[in-house]
């Protein structure tokens, strides 16, 4: 794990995180994801912001693909592993990230169109990617911060 000092952005500190700790965090996240899904709790994602501030290296690695994978896979095991959370794609600070909602969807779709499996075959079908994007768009339209 590499952490950057906000006051000295060019300096970083490396911290060893044990595999057992990582496995524990993964199990807690999976349990929370299933709880969120069962209660209909929505999760907002900000792909460009998440790429900059997290450990993912590309849009194709974004956690949204693990949180909700209906229509992009028919692998029963992968479908069962995913909590199928009510997710949405959003933008973070437009002044900092210079993006739009349309751009965030396009970045995810373009990244997914390039992903290949172990044999070098395209992992996702373009039509399925756009169905997945549309499902997420609809979930985003239903999410609200209202108490009603």
Predicted regions and their residues:
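Short acidic/histidine-rich active-site segments
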Residues: 45-48, 83-100
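Mid-to-C-terminal alpha-helical segments outside catalytic/metal-binding sites
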Residues: 30-39, 103, 107-148
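Short beta-alpha connecting loops at secondary-structure transitions
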Residues: 51, 88-91, 120-125
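Secondary-structure transition/capping motifs at alpha-helix termini
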Residues: 39, 70-81, 114-119
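Short, small-residue-biased leader/transition segments that mark boundaries at the very start
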Residues: 1-3
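Amphipathic alpha-helical protein-protein interaction segments
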Residues: 22-25, 53, 94, 98, ...
């Amino acid at each position: 794990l590499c952490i950057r000092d906000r006051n000295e952005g060019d300096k970083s500190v490396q911290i060893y995180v044990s595999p057992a700790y990582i496995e524990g965090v993964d199990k807690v996240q999976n349990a929370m994801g299933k709880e969120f899904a069962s209660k209909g709790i929505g999760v907002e994602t900000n792909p460009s912001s998440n790429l900059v501030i997290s450990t993912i290296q590309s849009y194709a690695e974004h956690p949204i693909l693990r949180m909700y994978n209906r229509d992009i896979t028919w692998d029963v095991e992968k479908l069962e592993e995913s909590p199928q959370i009510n997710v949405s794609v959003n933008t973070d600070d437009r002044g900092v990230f210079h993006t739009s909602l349309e751009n965030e969807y396009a970045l995810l779709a373009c990244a997914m169109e390039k992903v290949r499996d172990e044999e070098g075959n395209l992992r996702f079908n373009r039509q399925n990617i756009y169905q997945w994007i549309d499902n997420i768009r609809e979930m985003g339209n239903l999410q609200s911060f209202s108490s009603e």
